[in-house]
Structures are given as structure tokens and as C-alpha cells.
Amino acid sequence: MTKPIITFNNVSKTFEDSGTQVLKNINFDLEEGKFYTLLGASGSGKSTILNIMAGLLDASSGDIYLDGERINDLPINKRDIHTVFQNYALFPHMTVFENVAFALKLKKVDKKEIAKRVKETLKMVQLEGYENRSIQKLSGGQRQRVAIARAIINQPRVVLLDEPLSALDLKLRTEMQYELRELQQRLGITFVFVTHDQEEALAMSDWVFVMNEGEIVQSGTPVDIYDEPINHFVANFIGESNIINGTMIEDYLVSFNGKEFESVDGGMRPNEPVEVVIRPEDLQITLPEEGKLQVKVDTQLFRGVHYEIIAYDELGNEWMIHSTRKAIEGEVIGLDFTPEDLHIMRLNETEEEFDARIEEYVEMDEPEDGLINAIEEERNEENL
């Protein structure tokens, strides 16, 4: 890892008036030029971390570093960090130009330089020609672009974004995800994004921190977080999951529903109680006699791209299946899956223990060398 641009070292926060501890020994290093997301439900502590970075809140204990310099006592205006707030915090009585130029005017930058940089920045956020437009006459998406332009015009080392997409409708929110990600990559500025939306975090981030009750439960790439959740909370919080109690018979062999199945997980004690995760999209519907499990369809909903089917096995376990095929309520179907579709979770495993075990024991698929090569490989395997 290169020298971190931001470091949190054992940072905790307790509100003195209520005695509530909202952050518990937070530790992380952020690299320059990456897109990071703090993901968690309301009250998980994610916005508190953002406010401590910005200097809006003081940490109760621990150290915060910006580019190697301890900044716990550094005033907000001395930190090379800019924040985009949820409500955008724009000046309603000013034009787009005046809002974006505000920070440059405070620094007494030359007027010609201000005009040049405002024009360049508005072009970056697709608001070229909006300089004289009143803020009050802009749409929600346009206001958000103004807030982002104001945050990046000084080319800060870090931009903090506190749920800036939450007020937008679904279509515009999706468009802005692409725009934000592309803008961050083009500028090379470190973005720290706060959201409760799992899909948003997975789609935009280089690295995700999953938070719960003031702690970082798991951190990793979006693919790692989704495919290898550390515990029940993460598996449930990130996407949809079928979570079944099981027993790890030995390395790469797990038992649940009274049957034994091959897996790609290891590094656990023989006959250790575990939880088994199978994502709904990884379950294939087949004939009852051909399935590894048999379930009875209870209900289904059409979700546009797939049917969401709820079924129950003979032990009463609920199964969610995503399928492009429509089922019939009351019919018995078979469920098939591969060893790679099973993810085994130990009970009460720390992130350090989890990472070490995954690296040593879990058999990971080799990365695909593009879609075309992957399709050709599949066809070659079918022809063997």
C-alpha cells in the first residue's frame, strides 16, 4: 500500500450529554485517488466518521492523520478536505457561478482565474452555460452538480459526500452514480462516500466499509463483500441471502438439511457449527428428483428482471430464488447449486481471522479475461 492520505487510529466518539458511544476504536488507512464508501444503516456511525474527517466533530479519543499530519486540532478551513452535504448547503440567493466561485473569492483569487476555473469545473459536471442561473430554478440533480462543482473547484485532496443522492429519484440517482464515479476517476481525488444503499455502494466503490453500531464489521472490495460476507449481519445487509445453519464436516465438506455438500471453504474445526450462505441468483431450478434440495413454492413476485420465488423445504427453512422462469404456487421443485455457490461463515470470527482463513483456504475462481474469452471458454467446455 502507498502512503495513506487519511488514517484513523483507534478513533472513538462518545457524546458527553447522553453518554452514547457512537464510534468504537475505528482504524483504517485510505489511499489517494480511490473511491471509498462507508455503508451502514441509520445510526451506524458512518456520518460521524465523515464529520470527524471534516473537522465538524471532535473525536473523543484516537488520532486522525491527513497525509501523515495529525489533524485532530486543525481547524476546518485549514484541512484540504471539502464536503458535499445531503442538503447540498448551497446559497439560494446566489447564482450558479457565485456559488461555485465562493471559495475562490474568499481566497482572493484573480477574477479572470475565477472565471476560467468556474467554467472548467461546470463543464466537468455538465452544467456549462448555467453560470447565471438561479439556484432556486434548478432541479435536484442540477443542484447536486453545483454542490459537487463547489467541492472540487479548489482541487482538494479529499472530497466527502454525505448521502448526496438520497433525495433524487431512482433514474436520476442511477445516472449520477455513473457521473460521480467517472468524475472521481478523471480527477484522481480521494472520494469518501456515505450511504445506506447497498447497491449504490457496490456499484461505485473501490473499497467498502460496512458499519454496524459504531464499528467497522467488514471492509473490502465490493466483490469481496458480496461474495465473501464475514457474518450473518453482512450477508443479510448486502443483497439478498439464504442463510442456513450447518456443520463443517471437514475442509471443503459441509452438512446442512441432513445432507453433505462439497464447498470451497476450509480452515475450520471438524464438525464446527457454521452458517451457510447461498445467494438467490445462484440457485438453479430443476426437476425435484434432479435437485440437491427439494422445496415447495409458497409465493412469488415479478421483479422485472426476474421472479422472486419464496419456497420452503421439508424442515421449514425458507428459500428465496431468483429465476427468469415463472413458478406455480404449491408445486415442488428441485434446487441445484455448485460448490462455488456456497459460502461458509464461522460464528464470531474476527475480520483478521476471516481474512487470513480466506487467503489460505478458500479456493477462489481465477479472474476472467474479458467477457468474450469467458464465453469462448464456456463453449469449449460444453464441446468436450
UniProtKB/Swiss-Prot annotation:
Any one GO CC term of the record: ATP-binding cassette (ABC) transporter complex
Catalytic activity, as annotated: ATP + H2O + polyamine-[polyamine-binding protein]Side 1 = ADP + phosphate + polyamineSide 2 + [polyamine-binding protein]Side 1
Group of enzyme by EC: translocase
Positions that bind ATP: G40, A41, S42, G43, S44, G45, K46, S47
**Localization of this protein:** Cell membrane
State the annotated membrane topology for this chain: Peripheral membrane protein
Q: Which residues form the ABC transporter domain?
A: 6-238
Per the record, the domain of life is Bacteria
This protein's major location comes to membrane
The protein's matches in PROSITE patterns, at most eight in alphabetical order, are given as: ABC_TRANSPORTER_1, ABC_TRANSPORTER_2, POTA
Q: Name one GO molecular function term.
A: ATP hydrolysis activity
Extract the Pfam families matched here: ABC_tran, TOBE_2
Give the EC number: 7.6.2.11
Q: InterPro entries given for it? A: AAA+_ATPase (IPR003593), ABC_SmlMolc_Importer (IPR050093), ABC_transporter-like_ATP-bd (IPR003439), ABC_transporter-like_CS (IPR017871), Mo/tungstate-bd_C_term_dom (IPR008995), P-loop_NTPase (IPR027417), PotA-like (IPR005893), Transp-assoc_OB_typ2 (IPR013611)
The record's listing under NCBIfam families reads: potA (TIGR01187)
Q: Tell me the function of this protein.
A: Part of the ABC transporter complex PotABCD involved in spermidine/putrescine import. Responsible for energy coupling to the transport system.
> Which PANTHER family has this protein been placed in?
SPERMIDINE/PUTRESCINE IMPORT ATP-BINDING PROTEIN POTA (PTHR42781), SPERMIDINE_PUTRESCINE IMPORT ATP-BINDING PROTEIN POTA (PTHR42781:SF4)
**What is stated as this protein's family in its record?**
Belongs to the ABC transporter superfamily. Spermidine/putrescine importer (TC 3.A.1.11.1) family.
Quaternary data: The complex is composed of two ATP-binding proteins (PotA), two transmembrane proteins (PotB and PotC) and a solute-binding protein (PotD).
Name of the protein in its database record: Spermidine/putrescine import ATP-binding protein PotA
Instruction: Please report the organism this UniProt entry assigns to the protein.
Output: Streptococcus pyogenes serotype M3 (strain ATCC BAA-595 / MGAS315)
